[in-house]
């Protein structure tokens, strides 16, 4: 029987005078990759930021592994085993790739303090991280920066990985690398929640799908069923069929 890892129930979020989320109900199954889709302005990024405590829910609850995390501060949420990669990637451009990785490794002050086996595995997932180890992160390409951002998020073991638009602006070869990496993370038991605009990327990778519109989740189901129903895709996403 599938186990729910993350649950949002009736979540509403207001930012100043703006009421952005209007009662979001969402479940993420442990071990699955859930795609959160929707047009621009649907509330996807706000949902991720609300999960992470970066913006506070004005009502409703966010639960992780059976624990109410709605009011927890962001650092405490992260310590529960949740990593978040925003669309801006959150890397330090003036630091080297190595220094970026060290900053993400909470208990390591030197490379020698890092989990050697895990670091080797990350290098296998993202060869660019090893190749450009001593390069300033700001000189990397967009795809290489995205790889570094995800590598930083998994430098320590995580139960849940949340990423906002990982395929945005990436070349097809980098997208394929990302798909392989996410598949490997899933194989290692990491649960993943991705926001995406690239429907083809989403179809190739997702187990489950939730579609947002006007601050609400208006569709939930399997990605296989969603991918097979072009009329549903067109009605929810405005896609040409």
Functional labels for PLM-detected ranges:
Residues 52:
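Helix-to-loop junction immediately C-terminal to a conserved catalytic motif
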Residues 136-140:
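Conserved ABC ATPase signature
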Residues 6-8, 21:
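Conserved structural motif at the start of ABC-family nucleotide-binding domains
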Residues 60-68, 80, 114-119:
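Conserved ABC transporter NBD signature motif
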Residues 37-39:
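The feature captures the beta-strand-to-loop junction immediately N-terminal to the Walker
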Residues 154-159:
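A short, proline-enriched helix->beta-strand linker immediately N-terminal to the Walker B motif
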Residues 16, 97-117, 125-127, 221, ...:
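ABC-type ATPase nucleotide-binding domains, specifically the catalytic core motifs of the NBD
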């Amino acid at each position: 029987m599938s186990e729910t890892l993350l649950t949002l129930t009736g979540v509403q979020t207001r930012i100043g005078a703006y009421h952005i989320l209007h009662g979001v109900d969402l479940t993420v199954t442990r071990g699955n990759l859930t795609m959160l889709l929707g047009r621009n302005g649907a509330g996807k990024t706000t949902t991720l930021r609300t999960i992470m405590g970066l913006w506070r829910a004005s009502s409703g609850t966010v639960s992780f592994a059976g624990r109410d995390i709605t009011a927890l501060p962001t650092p405490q949420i992260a310590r529960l085993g949740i990593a978040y990669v925003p669309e801006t990637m959150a890397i330090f451009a003036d630091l080297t790739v190595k220094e970026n990785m060290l900053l993400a490794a909470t208990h390591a002050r030197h490379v020698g303090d890092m989990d050697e086996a895990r670091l080797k595995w990350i290098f296998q997932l993202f060869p660019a991280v090893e190749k450009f180890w001593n390069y300033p992160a700001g000189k990397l390409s967009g795809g290489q920066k995205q790889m570094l951002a995800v590598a930083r998020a998994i430098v320590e073991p995580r139960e849940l990985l949340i990423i906002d638009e990982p395929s945005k602006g990436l070349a097809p070869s980098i997208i394929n690398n990302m798909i392989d990496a996410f598949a490997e993370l899933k194989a290692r038991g990491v649960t993943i929640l991705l926001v995406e605009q690239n429907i083809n990327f989403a179809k190739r990778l997702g187990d489950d799908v939730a579609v947002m519109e006007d601050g609400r989740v208006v569709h939930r189901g399997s990605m296989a069923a969603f991918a097979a129903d072009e009329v549903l895709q067109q009605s929810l996403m405005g896609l040409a069929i």
